[in-house]
Amino acid sequence: MSWQTYVDDHLMADIEGQQGNHLAAAAILGNDGSVWAQSTTFPKFKPEEITNIMKDFDEPGHLAPTGLFLGGAKYMVIQGEPGAVIRGKKGSGGITIKKTNQALIFGIYEEPVTPGQCNMVVEKIGDYLVDQGY
């Protein structure tokens, strides 16, 4: 299965069978910031934004004072799982980032998708990839 298939058929799929109820954007990036696959809606990001995200996985709390930036958009960092999951909020939407051994799984949501639904979608794929050795 290609990385793009994971994005298109899993991360961007309708949630709980509700047509049109899906993440706003998603991507799988290598831990070095290289894009493995992304939705057409995923924001163009700066390398230093990924560097800062990786630093927060290594040093939990690093992003809390400044916020998480992706594609120039600022997210307020909310409770995640230190070293494994970063969650952010921006208005009525937000972001979930799951770190695996080799990759970062990104999910960006807007209403009507809930934070919990985004977490479920992103973390499910992330956990699967960890189980597969990625």
UniProtKB/Swiss-Prot annotation:
GO terms for cellular component: cell cortex; cytoskeleton. The keyword Phosphoprotein applies. The keyword Ligase does not apply. It is found in: Cytoplasm, Cytoskeleton. Its main location: cytoplasm. SUPFAM superfamilies: Profilin (actin-binding protein). Phosphorylated by MAP kinases. Keywords: Actin-binding, Allergen, Cytoplasm, Cytoskeleton, Phosphoprotein. The modification Phosphothreonine is found at residue 114. One of its GO terms (molecular function) is actin monomer binding. Binds to actin and affects the structure of the cytoskeleton. At high concentrations, profilin prevents the polymerization of actin, whereas it enhances it at low concentrations. By binding to PIP2, it inhibits the formation of IP3 and DG. Occurs in many kinds of cells as a complex with monomeric actin in a 1:1 ratio. PANTHER family: PROFILIN, PROFILIN-5. Belongs to the profilin family. This is Profilin-2. It comes from Nicotiana tabacum (Common tobacco). The lineage of its organism: Eukaryota, Viridiplantae, Streptophyta, Embryophyta, Tracheophyta. The gene is PRO2.
